[in-house]
């Protein structure tokens, strides 16, 4: 089997195989053959559960934004979609852990290395074995699947890291919201009114009672305080009410107003009992409206509508009781 034809050129002497020597030239051939097969296996849909897991993880990455994009946008997607994606990813990761306790790369890589080493050693001895070539192709396909699984595992790890960052951000927001809610609750508790000191009477009852007694009650005498500057260049409201203009507004008779303006003119009358200028009749030379003029004069001096008007009309002398010229003992002397 090792005999060579006569017309063939002599071959160089064989060199012992070492991992770093140039004799391992067939290795790149196997790697170049694995590339199209790897692309073919990645394009096939539904080959195994790992392919579906990879597709699902890619969909999760497209749906869930990263922390940078969420911070730039100012708000994150709906909490429901993030929770669903997070639960879906956790369930898929749990399935992978249950099915494969250990990654295939841990078994495929040593098997591929041993098969490749045996194949290279056989080629170095000019002993080409068909079974080693087929075994190398099988181990190479298994190694490609293991590499694909390793890529999926790395992508899943990146997705888990991104979801953990999103979860930490949401946890921070939830803590801030809980802290703010606690502060608001504390403030609202402090702002609650004290029901013990609160009056049980309603405003409607108070208004109804005030309307009922409004026609029978008045304000206190000194309800309105005297203004601070009472001596102003113009008269105050109370003085204007006591004047003649206020009496005219009330509707007094012009004759009575004339008597108030000049009471002496109507106090002295003629002897024949006829009052001049159309005045009221007289008796015994004394005008009858003398007391009325005195009452109006008292009203002007004490104030219009005062409480002393009734007493003055009933007893004309009671208005002069406070004067020095009136002596109560004169009546007693006359009786004696």
Curated annotation (Swiss-Prot):
<dbReference type="InterPro" id="IPR019258">
    <property type="entry name" value="Mediator_Med4"/>
</dbReference>
<feature type="coiled-coil region">
    <location>
        <begin position="154"/>
        <end position="192"/>
    </location>
</feature>
<dbReference type="GO" id="GO:0003712">
    <property type="term" value="F:transcription coregulator activity"/>
</dbReference>
<feature type="region of interest" description="Disordered">
    <location>
        <begin position="59"/>
        <end position="85"/>
    </location>
</feature>
<keyword id="KW-0804">Transcription</keyword>
<comment type="similarity">
    <text>Belongs to the Mediator complex subunit 4 family.</text>
</comment>
<dbReference type="GO" id="GO:0016592">
    <property type="term" value="C:mediator complex"/>
</dbReference>
<keyword id="KW-0539">Nucleus</keyword>
<dbReference type="Pfam" id="PF10018">
    <property type="entry name" value="Med4"/>
</dbReference>
<dbReference type="GO" id="GO:0006357">
    <property type="term" value="P:regulation of transcription by RNA polymerase II"/>
</dbReference>
<feature type="region of interest" description="Disordered">
    <location>
        <begin position="281"/>
        <end position="336"/>
    </location>
</feature>
<comment type="function">
    <text>Component of the Mediator complex, a coactivator involved in the regulated transcription of nearly all RNA polymerase II-dependent genes. Mediator functions as a bridge to convey information from gene-specific regulatory proteins to the basal RNA polymerase II transcription machinery. Mediator is recruited to promoters by direct interactions with regulatory proteins and serves as a scaffold for the assembly of a functional preinitiation complex with RNA polymerase II and the general transcription factors.</text>
</comment>
<keyword id="KW-0010">Activator</keyword>
<dbReference type="GO" id="GO:0070847">
    <property type="term" value="C:core mediator complex"/>
</dbReference>
<keyword id="KW-0805">Transcription regulation</keyword>
<feature type="compositionally biased region" description="Acidic residues">
    <location>
        <begin position="325"/>
        <end position="336"/>
    </location>
</feature>
<keyword id="KW-0175">Coiled coil</keyword>
<comment type="subunit">
    <text>Component of the Mediator complex.</text>
</comment>
<feature type="region of interest" description="Disordered">
    <location>
        <begin position="1"/>
        <end position="45"/>
    </location>
</feature>
<protein>
    <recommendedName>
        <fullName>Mediator of RNA polymerase II transcription subunit 4</fullName>
    </recommendedName>
</protein>
């Amino acid at each position: 089997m090792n005999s060579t034809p006569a017309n063939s050129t002599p071959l160089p002497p064989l060199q012992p195989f070492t991992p770093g020597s140039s004799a391992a030239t067939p290795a790149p051939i196997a790697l170049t053959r694995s590339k199209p097969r790897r692309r073919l296996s990645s394009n096939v849909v539904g080959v195994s559960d790992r392919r579906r897991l990879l597709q699902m993880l890619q969909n999760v990455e497209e749906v869930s934004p990263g922390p940078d994009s969420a911070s730039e946008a100012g708000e994150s997607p709906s909490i429901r979609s993030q929770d669903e994606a997070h639960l879906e990813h956790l369930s898929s990761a749990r399935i992978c852990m249950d099915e494969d306790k250990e990654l295939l790369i841990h078994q495929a890589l040593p098997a591929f290395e041993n098969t490749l080493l045996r194949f290279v050693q056989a080629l170095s001895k000019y002993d080409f074995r068909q079974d080693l070539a087929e075994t190398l192709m099988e181990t190479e396909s298994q190694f490609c699947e293991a590499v694909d699984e390793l890529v999926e595992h790395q992508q899943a790890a990146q997705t888990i890291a991104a979801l953990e960052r999103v979860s930490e951000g949401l946890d921070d927001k939830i803590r801030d919201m809980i802290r703010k809610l606690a502060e608001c609750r504390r403030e609202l508790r402090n702002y609650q009114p004290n029901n013990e000191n609160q009056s049980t009477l309603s405003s409607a009852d108070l208004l109804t009672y005030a309307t009922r007694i409004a026609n029978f009650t008045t304000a206190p005498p000194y309800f309105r305080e005297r203004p601070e500057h009472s001596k102003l260049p113009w008269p105050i409201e109370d003085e204007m009410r006591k004047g003649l203009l206020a009496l005219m507004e009330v509707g007094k008779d012009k004759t009575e107003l004339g008597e108030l303006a000049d009471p002496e003119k109507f106090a002295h009358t003629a002897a024949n009992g006829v009052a001049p200028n159309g005045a009221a009749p007289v008796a015994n030379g004394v005008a009858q409206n003398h007391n009325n003029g005195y009452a109006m004069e008292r009203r002007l001096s004490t104030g219009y509508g005062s409480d002393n008007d009734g007493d003055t009309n009933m007893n004309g002398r009671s208005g002069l009781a406070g004067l020095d010229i009136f002596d109560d003992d004169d009546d007693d002397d006359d009786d004696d």
